[in-house]
Amino acid sequence: RGVRVSCETAPHYLLLCDEDLQEDGRFKMNPPLRSREDRAALIAGVADGTIEVIATDHAPHTAEEKSRGLAGSAMGIVGLECAFPLMYKYMVLPGTLTLEKLVALMSDNPRRIFGLGGGLNVGGEADFTVLALGAQYEIDPAAFLSKGRATPFAGWPVQGRAVLTVVGGREAYRDDGLQL
């Protein structure tokens, strides 16, 4: 029929399964976490190109909205601040994905699929992020810039941190505390 179809997943579906669930609003997301076998199928789909995008699924909620346990909390978790470092540490460094493939999944492919400009084209308004790939730290929700702090990854060791983001040719974010 000529219908264009794409497929995405998010870091929490690649790194967690239903065995990881806790009675805590930080674990309430839609769709919910599935089985270990489902998680393995998603990883295979990312590796073989069936899944073209890893999105953040960023759904920030206040502490109040996420404090009502698994059943009563608002749906969704934050993902923006921890998506890249999680994927780099747990998918690239072990060899499941290359860094180039991760960049395509998180940046190039979404831009292409949605027909967005940006990137690094001569004469265009640059969109890019500079990453400190050697930066190792633990995910600390208190350090998030988003209004949401609800992440099932609190305390997880990660690697790779955004130190500069340029959007439309203008600096949008700079981490002045990290040496390049």
PLM regions with names:
Residues 11, 60, 135:
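Short, glycine/acidic-enriched loop or turn micro-motifs at the edges of active sites
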Residues 1, 16-21, 64-68, 141-143:
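Short acidic, glycine/serine/threonine-rich loops at helix termini
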Residues 26-27, 47-48, 53-54, 59-131:
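His/Asp/Glu-enriched, well-ordered alpha-helical/loop segment
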Residues 38-42, 116-118, 151:
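A generic local structural motif
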Residues 1-54:
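Histidine/acidic residue-rich metal-binding segments in metalloenzymes
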Residues 28-38, 74-78, 151-158:
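A short acidic, glycine-rich active-site loop
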Residues 72, 122-177:
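C-terminal cap of metal-dependent C-N hydrolases
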